[in-house]
Structure formats: C-alpha cells, structure tokens
Amino acid sequence: MESAGKQDNNATQQLPQRQQRGNQQANKNLGKHNAQKQNDSADGGPAEKKQRFGGPNAQNQNQNQNQNGGVTGGGGAVGGPNQNKNFGNNKGGFVGNRNRNNNRAGNQNRTFPGNNNPNQKPNNETSKADGPNALAKNNEPATAAAGQNQANQNANKGQNQRQGQNQNQNQVHGQGNQGGPGNQGGAGNQGGQGNQGGAGNQGNGQGFRGRNAGNNQGGGFSGGPQNQQRDNRNRSGPRPGGGAGGAMNSTNMGGGGGGGGGGGPRGGEDFFITQRLRSISGPTFELEPVEVPTETKFSGRNRLYVGNLTNDITDDELREMFKPYGEISEIFSNLDKNFTFLKVDYHPNAEKAKRALDGSMRKGRQLRVRFAPNATILRVSNLTPFVSNELLYKSFEIFGPIERASITVDDRGKHMGEGIVEFAKKSSASACLRMCNEKCFFLTASLRPCLVDPMEVNDDTDGLPEKAFNKKMPDFNQERSIGPRFADPNSFEHEYGSRWKQLHNLFKTKQDALKRELKMEEDKLEAQMEYARYEQETELLRQELRKREVDNERKKLEWEMREKQAEEMRKREEETMRRHQTEMQSHMNRQEEDMLRRQQETLFMKAQQLNSLLDQQEGFGGGGGGNNSTFDNFAGNSNSPFEVFRGNNNNNSTMIGNNAAPNTQDSFAFEFGVNNMNQGGNQRGNNGGGNNVPWGRRRF
C-alpha cells in the first residue's frame, strides 16, 4: 500500500490542514485505550494532513480498498455519488456523511481555521439541517486521499477511528455518533478485511454479528447491499444506535443491527421442531410409559399476582414476605402500576401464600393476591379415540419441555376427544399454538387435525369472599335488600323467572342441536374422507398400473429390438462365414494351381537337366567330322533306347551303334522338335543356324 498521499502535478503549495481543537483530547472514545494510529503524532494528536488533491486517477483508486464504507475521513470530506463506488464491500457503514451533518450539537466534526489552516474553507463550519447530504465537489476525494486511506486500512482494524480529516475526534462505529463526549464503540468494526463488528456497539449490546447480507458486518449504518452511497444520503437515518441493520436484514436468521433491524424469521425454531418431528413420525404401536414427576418446582401453575403494592417495594422485601410459605423465583415487578408477578416453588405453598396474604395490609394498602393466568396450558381437541396420554406427550414434546399431558375422559373412562398439555415455558406453548393453527398437525393415520386453543385454568378455590365487595355501592345495597325466596305461582316474579328459564332452555336446546349437527357433519366428513382415501389409493394403483404397462411396453420393445439385433447379428455372422468359406475355397484353388505350376516347372527343370546330361553323353561318343555329333548307346549295348534324328542340316549325322543301320527309323519314334535349324528349340546340328530347339528328333 502507499503510505503517502498523492501529489498533484500542478500543486505549488501545501493544502490547508486541520488543527486540533483546544485542549480537547484527540481520542474521545471514553473508556477505551486505543493504540496510537500510524498517522498520529507522538503526543496523541493527529499528524499533519496530507495533500488533498491527488493525480487524475486519485478519485477512483480507492474503490476496492476503502472498506470503511465510502467516507473514512469523518465529517471533513463528504463522499460524492461517483467518487467511491465500493458498493459490494461496504463493511463499515456510511457514517462520514452522517457525522458531517447530523452531529452539529456536539461540534464533533467542525474544524476551526487557525494558524495551521489559513486556507480552510468556511463552508465546513456552516450548520445544515439533517437530511440528505450535499454533493461533494469532484476535486475533493471522498476518502480524503486514495493513498492515505490505503495506508490507514490496516490501522482501522482495531479502532476504526477517523484519521486524516476528522483528527480522531469522531469515532464513528459502535454506538454511532451520539454527538457528545460519550461517543463509544470505536473498538468494534474490526475494519479492513474482517470487519466483524463483534466488540463494537457495546453500548447498545447489539452489533452486526456478520449476518447482514452483502458483507456488511460492521457496526455502521444501513448495512447490507442497500448501503450504497449513490445520492450521498445516509440510508440509516438519524438513528444513533448503530444503524438500521440493513435492508436485507429481515431475511437473516437472528439478524439485528445495532439498535435496529430486529430479529429474522423464526426459521431456526421451526427447523428444529421439524427435525424432532421426523424422529417420531414412524409407527406408534408401542409407546413407553411417560414418567412425569408429581409436581414440578416453579411451574406455571404456581405463578401469583400480587397487586396494590407501593412503588418502593424491592425483590428482597418480596422474598421476606413470602419466606414463611416457600421459595419464590422469577420476580417481575411493575412499580409504575404497583403490581408484581412471581412463582412459588410448589402449588400447595402458593395456595397457602394466597390465602394468607390476600387482603393483608402493608403500608396502609390492602394487598390482592391471585393466581396469575397460566399461558402454558393448552387445550387439544378433535382427537381420535386412539390417542393416549403417552402419544399426546410424545407428539407435543417436539415444541418444548412438557410438565403434564393427559386425555380427558368421562366418569366411565370413555375418550372425550380432547386433552390438556401443560408446557414448562410460555415460549414453547406459543410456538405450539402458532404452528398448529398455521398448519394441520395429525397425531395418527386419520386426517383429523388436532385443534389447539389456550386453556384458562382457574385454580382459585376460594371464590369471592364477602370482604371483596364494596358495600358502599348503591347496586350492592339494592341487590342485598331482599333475601333468598321462592316465587309464588302466577306472580310477577314467577313470570319473569320463567322467561329466564325458557331463555336458558332455548340456549341448551340450540346447543344440543348444534352439537348433534356437528356430530352428523363430522360423520359425513369422516365418510367422505374414507371414500376420498379409497379413491386416492385406487388412483395411485391406477397410476402404478399405467406405469407398469408403460414399462411392459418398453420392455417388449426392448425385447423385440434385441431379437432384431440378434437376427441381424446372426445374418451378419452367416454372411461372414460364407464369405470366409469362399475365400478359403479360392485360396485352396490358388494353392492347387500354384502346386501344379510348380510341378510343371519342376518337370521342365528335370527335362532340361536330362537334356543337358544327354548332351554331355553325346559329346563323349566322338566320331565324324565337322559339326556332326553322334549319340552312342551306353555300355556298348546294341539296343540303344534313344535315337536322335537331327534335322536337315548341311551335315547329316545318324546315331551310331553297334547294330544300327544307316538312315533307318524305328517304328516308335517321337519328334520333339522341328526339322528346321532356324526355328524354336535348342536344335542340334549346324551351329550356324542357331540352337533354339532342344532336340531335333528322338525316338524312344
């Protein structure tokens, strides 16, 4: 990061500087001992201000580095609509504009011209009404300087004190700028990268816990992606409690900004209830008996109301007052209206305390002690006859701890279709009442949802004693002027008494008729439900049947396709086999032809060898002159097997043998050549005519 401010190329002198106000300390974060900032001087005061004007790109260099929400200089520099567009990473909240205009009472952000800042602009001291901030000039960067803000980015992690223009006098985050010396919360907004804001807003006890949408985790104003400095308006308004919690805070679980925002939806509670419900959604044939203690200590039934107290009573005095009757807890006193709610350990002790203290005098006032309304008891109706105490307990235990759960029966032990569930906490009863009214909660396979209503249980067995009446009232005296009596027949009293009886009898008749009608409608709905269930099951079976038919058709098509593929494969294999056999046959024929050709060549070679051998032997015979050659028989045998007749050469020669006659031919003779010395073959004879005929004429 750059540690020094940008220098303007045209700047000839140093810009005006802010001075420290009087002897007032620079750090107004009361109760906080913050480390010295990087731009602070040795005595705790702010260092000299860097030059305010940067280069041509000084306004936009800090778009992604300013994690304090756009305006880090406090009230000095007002962020313009286009100078800092760090909309996605606004982790600190837009507090600079608010400190600029909303804290005029405490004078936290005003600068005073002096020796060190002779060129201070006078419009920084003018007070303006709360509302939208004025647009900043384009030549004044909203972040005081791009390089200066980058240098102070890491220094903002611990304190987020506004250095530079604000001179550490306005610690913005935390409780916001309260305008006075108690401007706390600077230790929150751990700025820069994390900016978790956990320790911030400690004055309010609430902070941005990191659940706001859009990375707004600091204790600033109007967190979330809606915190955009487009119009230079502080979207959180003048709330000093740490901001409104962000526009998207309503969708967060728990949520809650600093002093605003509020909690998110009850998604977490509903989620855990749903998870517990899934664990018991199976069959409930065998349920273990529920062992509930006879009486729970400090239960909702033991809550007493004590009225007509003095406004100076304390919890210790109440404990001392109820000490003879037992231990008390959960005391809630409203001294403005002079009443108190408290819980006694056990119900008998609560009854004793009520009887003893009700009507007693304390400091000239008559105390009134009553059992407080118990909002933890619910009446569950529209139950089927197969719901037991154990099933009722297990079913409603998902909403919270239960002290008692029982089914209401008549004097014969018959199921009355309703029950009572008493929770240990009011929040559990409220969650049960809300979810059962919003949704349909079934306990068995029947589609009759249970109906849940608050049940008013009157544990007051004392009734209304005579001392509770104000006997000075005229109505009391008029009513008590005549005592008990029976009316005489056909008298005025008897006539109007009979009318009252008829009215109540009519009510009972209509009530009974309504109950019978309700019973008939319930039976009718039950029959419709069973028929609809049967139709639904039948429709499911039809759908399953159609699905199976579709699957059957698909499988049939697949089988036919496989058969077709197998037939095609068989045909291809047959064709391949036939082609292979044809190739084998042709190959065998070629081999046979080659063998015959080789045999012929072999015979021809042997004939040539034999011819050459005969030629050699003819050369051994000798005789004759010129080119005549004779063929003598072997071993001087007169019966020579061969006789060669040579062609019409110039010099005819005949085979010479012992018994051979000249120019005589054998009856069996075979002529191998031609009688022409100039045609074909290796012809013997005159060498002048060529040697193309292998033999002239031979006789075997």
From Swiss-Prot:
From which residue to which does any coiled coil extend? 505-616
One protein family per Pfam: NOPS
Question: What is one term from the GO cellular component aspect held by the record?
Answer: precatalytic spliceosome
Q: Where is this region: Disordered?
A: 1-270, 568-591, 677-700
Keywords (alphabetical) are: Coiled coil, Phosphoprotein, Repeat, RNA-binding, Sensory transduction, Vision
Which positions does the record annotate as the modified residue Phosphoserine? 236
Gene Ontology terms for molecular function: mRNA binding; RNA binding
Q: Please indicate if the UniProt record lists Secreted as a keyword.
A: no
Point to the regions of Basic and acidic residues compositional bias: 568-582
Q: List, for all copies, the residue spans of the domain called RRM.
A: 302-374, 376-457
Q: What does this protein do?
A: Required for normal vision and courtship behavior in Drosophila.
Under the heading PROSITE patterns, the entry gives: RRM
Q: Which GO terms describe its biological process?
A: male courtship behavior, veined wing generated song production; mRNA splicing, via spliceosome; phototaxis; regulation of DNA-templated transcription; visual behavior; visual perception
- Low complexity composition bias: which ranges? 9-29, 54-69, 80-89, 96-124, 144-175
Protein name (database record): Protein no-on-transient A
Upper classification of the organism: Eukaryota, Metazoa, Ecdysozoa, Arthropoda, Hexapoda
- Domain of life where this protein originates: Eukaryota
Q: Is Transmembrane helix among this UniProt entry's keywords?
A: no
* Compositionally biased tracts (Gly residues): 70-79, 176-208, 253-266, 682-691
